[in-house]
């Protein structure tokens, strides 16, 4: 079972790295002014989406930690 956990953990680590890259790219878009001229609701939806990605990353980190402890 620990081999399965190890394999799953490695896959989740790769996915987490990808999510972190996308999160940073989206955050940088806003700081670079890419949303300039957009409506307030659009900007708020963008912010909500970025925060949802951050929350998903935290949940994924928690799962990875749990899998690591069960190895």
Would you name each region that the model predicts?
Residues 1-8, 12:
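Disorder-to-helix initiation segments
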Residues 11, 17-21, 25-70:
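Short, charge-rich amphipathic interface segments used for partner binding and complex assembly
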